[in-house]
Swiss-Prot record:
Effect of mutating P95A: In CMH10; with mid-left ventricular chamber thickening; decrease calcium binding affinity
Post-translational modification: N-terminus is methylated by METTL11A/NTM1.
Tissues/organs with expression: Highly expressed in type I muscle fibers.
List of residues binding Ca(2+): D37, N39, D41, D48
Function (record text): Contractile protein that plays a role in heart development and function. Following phosphorylation, plays a role in cross-bridge cycling kinetics and cardiac muscle contraction by increasing myosin lever arm stiffness and promoting myosin head diffusion; as a consequence of the increase in maximum contraction force and calcium sensitivity of contraction force.
Organism: Homo sapiens
Modification Deamidated asparagine, positions: N14
Protein name as annotated: Myosin regulatory light chain 2, ventricular/cardiac muscle isoform
Positions bearing Phosphoserine: S15, S19
GO molecular function, one term: myosin heavy chain binding
Amino acid sequence: MAPKKAKKRAGGANSNVFSMFEQTQIQEFKEAFTIMDQNRDGFIDKNDLRDTFAALGRVNVKNEEIDEMIKEAPGPINFTVFLTMFGEKLKGADPEETILNAFKVFDPEGKGVLKADYVREMLTTQAERFSKEEVDQMFAAFPPDVTGNLDYKNLVHIITHGEEKD
């Protein structure tokens, strides 16, 4: 009976961390974990991190740097611990700041506005592409100004707070 109880506790912990992410995200984390678990023992240790860095071209990583990474974990880093660590890091991320930073990549001068045509092109041709209808809906809800600029700072504020900035 005791092993079943232990298993239930582990299962409960798993269900909490696994509910933080969508299934596709969990699969992506699993792929990253598998790549980092160089010796395929189900745990990421110092040697795995060193080998991962080497595979990425960083061969002179200091022991202290690797030790600091390992210390972030509460114990041996299996997949559940790995997922929990990422969940805790992502949980603290401010959604408004995250979205603003994504727009700022395209606004190196920091004006707070982008040409609507450029935004439309980026949304329909890059990464997880929006459909024409989705972009049309966005511009219907957040129309560009008379000069064709989209005030992305205000857009992000409305997305994250549900109201316009004063």
